[in-house]
């Protein structure tokens, strides 16, 4: 059984990134299945730190962007919206080029919070970062109880 309340439409998800940090960094939603959502980002001058490696903050932006969208797809958006409460990341190895791909899987989907495990890897498939994102599920004013 799928965890998605709304079936992900990758074209629509990518269009939603226009004029946002996701657009600026080249984040693209690429795939989904019943239990995960996948996005990637280029490792280039937009996402490098001064020594030519993928900036840890850029990895966190990818993780939070992916997990936030995953939470959005799990709620009734006519009654709720989701916002980040906490994100942490362990940077495991540096990347210099190519793409970094992130896969988000739910750890907990509660009434008021969602927790996501997000694994990032380089083109070689080796892990580069492990992140955990906690999202608040917030009722729209006057809509949910």
Swiss-Prot record:
Q: Which Gene3D superfamilies match?
A: Hotdog Thioesterase
List the CDD domains hit by this protein, alphabetically: PaaI_thioesterase
The molecular function terms of the Gene Ontology recorded here are: 1,4-dihydroxy-2-naphthoyl-CoA thioesterase activity
Keywords attached to this Swiss-Prot or TrEMBL record, sorted alphabetically, are: Hydrolase
This enzyme's EC code(s): 3.1.2.-
| Pfam families on file | 4HBT
**PANTHER family named in the record:** 1,4-DIHYDROXY-2-NAPHTHOYL-COA THIOESTERASE 1
Q: Please identify the protein, giving its name as recorded.
A: Putative esterase PA1618
Supply the source organism's classification. Bacteria, Pseudomonadati, Pseudomonadota, Gammaproteobacteria, Pseudomonadales
């Amino acid at each position: 059984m799928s965890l998605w309340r709304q079936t992900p439409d990758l074209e629509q998800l990518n269009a939603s990134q226009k004029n946002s940090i996701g657009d600026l960094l080249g984040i693209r939603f690429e795939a989904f299945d019943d239990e995960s959502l996948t996005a990637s980002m280029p490792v280039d001058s937009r996402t490098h730190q001064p020594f030519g490696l993928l900036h840890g903050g850029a990895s966190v932006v990818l993780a939070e962007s992916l997990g936030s969208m995953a939470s959005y797809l799990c709620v009734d958006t006519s009654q709720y919206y989701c916002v980040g409460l906490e994100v942490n990341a362990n940077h495991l190895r540096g990347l210099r080029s190519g793409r970094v791909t992130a896969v988000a899987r739910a750890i907990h989907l509660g009434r008021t919070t969602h927790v996501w495990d997000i694994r990032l890897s380089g083109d070689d498939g080796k892990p580069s970062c492990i992140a955990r994102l906690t999202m608040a599920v917030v009722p729209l004013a006057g809509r949910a109880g």
